[in-house]
Amino acid sequence: HIFGRFGITAFALSGLDIALWDIAGKAAGVPLHRLIGGARRTRIPCYASFLRYTEPRLVAQYCERALGEGYTAIKLHEIDDAAVQAARHAVPAQVPLTVDVNCEWRLREAIEVASRWRSHALLWLEEPVFPPEDFRALRAVGEASGIPLAAGENLCFATQFEAMLDAGAVQ
């Protein structure tokens, strides 16, 4: 599913769009953020985002390391209950924990797993279902599990984002 079901063409076009904005900023002699309206913030919060390690011991170890380095939130890419549980045990309850499963499951399995993960107090669960543009399924997972959902990295067009929001698929 690496590029959703709309293909690599839309992603290639986004690269061209970025290049054109960069050229416009250089031609105007200003940083791009100024060209499109200026900075609204001088600082933004960030989180430590991990690879999928699978092994609970490693997940806990990386969580502890990230907290020691000053990160104030953690994003996992785990799909296994034990790995997510290990992270939650390593991360204090007041530290936001999120999980991006990269469209791992069909609806039924997504609901089952997300419901089990409710006890981990996730800040959000990201893209739990395939296909990524099945917005009804996304909404169903959120409603059944009570976990806020995040999605959109596989969407290409404003109309897709509009449909996702209209469907109530993400919170």
Place the predicted regions along the sequence by residue.
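N-terminal capping/lid subdomain adjacent to the active-site entrance of alpha/beta enzymes
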Residues: 1-98, 102-111, 115-119, 144
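Short glycine-/small-residue-rich flexible loop motifs, especially phosphate/cofactor-binding loops
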Residues: 22, 63, 139, 161-162
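Catalytic beta/alpha-barrel core
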Residues: 72-79, 98-103, 121-132, 148-156, ...
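Short acidic active-site motifs
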Residues: 83, 109, 133-137, 159-160
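Short amphipathic alpha-helical segments
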Residues: 88, 138-139
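Secondary-structure transition/capping motifs at alpha-helix termini
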Residues: 93-95, 167-170
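Catalytic cores of alpha/beta
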Residues: 107-117, 156-169
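Oxyanion-binding "anion nests"
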Residues: 142, 149, 165
